[in-house]
Amino acid sequence: AIGARTTESQIHRELASGISAPIGFKNGTDGNIKIATDAIQSASRGHHFLSVHKNGQVAIVHTKGNPDCHVILRGGKTPNYDAASVAAACKELEAAGLPATLMVDCSHGNSSKQHERQIVVADEIAAQLSAGSRQVFGLMVESHIKGGAQKFTPGKDQVSGLEYGKSITDACIDWDSSVRVMQTLSDAVKARRG
């Protein structure tokens, strides 16, 4: 995934155009998805740019475009995972000539940066799926063995002082909560299938 602060980067769009794997572009930190739709349109086309070859030499790279890019709703000034926000984003995707499906990031702006709220976000997406929605095709969840996060500064903090299984970056839900989220989503997909 390409983050909210990097989605506007032309370099990242060019690199994404040459990757033969699905790439998600997050909406802007303000919640705007236009920068993500613009990024998808750019990455879907071929580009020429200077890069470093696998042998370490400077080379001109030509990409063919990546047809497998998508939007990731990560929230902004307000969360954007509810059914109305998802429908509005899909309408914008359709207007841009893109598939009206997307991924939802349960963390960041959608959880108000409170890792436990990711479960609430996932439950809402599960309700949308159970009701028959096919607009959301995937979720991102910050998950680890233990919940929360711990501070670590390389060169300052001792590795031996770290708690095993706890994130040193973003706060995460714990493993048991992750299993419950996956089961809830699985049940929702089964309900949608009838």
Describe each region flagged by the PLM.
Residues 104, 174:
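Conserved, mostly hydrophobic/aromatic
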Residues 177, 185-194:
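Extended, intrinsically disordered, low-complexity segments
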Residues 69-70, 100-102:
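Conserved active-site beta-strand-loop modules that form the wall/rim of enzyme catalytic pockets
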Residues 98-99, 135:
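Short loop/turn motifs at secondary-structure junctions
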Residues 94-95:
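Catalytic-site microenvironment of enzymes
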Residues 1-81, 85, 108-109, 113, ...:
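Active-site-facing alpha/beta catalytic cores
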Residues 151-172:
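Acidic, Ser/Thr-rich peripheral helices and adjacent loops at domain boundaries
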